[in-house]
Amino acid sequence: EKAGYLSEEECARYTAEPLKLNFHVNDHKDGVAVYFRDYLRRYMMAKRPERSDYPSWNMVRFHQDSINWENDPLYGWCNKNRKKNGETYNLYSDGLRVYTTIDSRMQEYAEQAVYKHVVKYLQPAFNREIKGKKSAPYSGNLTMEQVNKILMRSVRQCERYRVLKESGATEEQIRKSFNTKTEMSVFTYHGEVDTIMTPLDSIRYYKSFLRCGFMSMCPQNGAVKAYVGGLNFTHFAYDMCMEGRRQVGSTIKPFLYSLAMENGFSPCDLAPNVQQTYMVAGKPWTPRNSSHSRYGEMVTLKWGLQQSNNWISAYLMSKLNPQAFVTL
């Protein structure tokens, strides 16, 4: 006992007691920066791009991937490099250590901020907007025929449809399956809940959730410090940060003003803050503006950018070469 050994009595007693385990399975869908880790996985495990693997409408992606394959050592690293036995590397089983620029503290703050902003403010506002509308969660400008067309496209893209199709089910049988109520667990912002609804209604339900993306980058060296591709990787694996496509909107304006500065304009130069009509591709185009503040005045370009004024942006665009803006 003095040497730290158990007596026979103690050994028998402890052996008879049940083991208390605190076992946790490590899942790639859990933890910090899930979307970033998945993006990095796909990037490092990418294979040499083959044109035949890309649909005709996505040739831009093929060209970009081809450039990455030739110029970026990290792109496809696992397939470009070989182990001593000649095999390619496995990101999961070969003991690789991958160092990134992600700041764990900033990442945690970013995930919390995105979640709070969407759940507390944006989603409730969107829910109020679509409440009671037949076309919900889509715009009221769409006809029901257009809404149903969008939903059916989503139906054909889901796993249930593929499984039924591969099993030989007819379109009528598939349609009946999607309109039959079934037990399922669905996502909520407060955890999964069990419910009963048709698979078609579940698609519409998931379409009502707002998607979001967030990325924080160091302006000095381009290092990514925080990366949020969505709110829940398990239910919304599509990465809105890198894969999501959207109109740039007013975020394009600083680039327009940068081009203007390169072409001799100054932040102090004056421009007419009035609505004007321009000829675009032989047709008249009249930009609108959300505010009429200082309408009719001569305002500085600095003020125009601060106010995100569409009329000043259109005025600048008329004075510059559109192609130069595209290639900026």
Where are the predicted features?
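Mid-domain, small-residue-enriched loop/turn segments at the edges of structured enzyme/sensor domains
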Residues: 284-289, 321-328
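Extended, non-catalytic substrate-recognition/exosite surfaces adjacent to catalytic cores, especially
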Residues: 1-283, 288-290, 302-303, 315
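Metal-dependent DNA phosphodiester-chemistry modules and their immediately adjacent helices/loops
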Residues: 293-321
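Short glycine-/small-residue-rich flexible loop motifs, especially phosphate/cofactor-binding loops
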Residues: 257, 314, 323-327
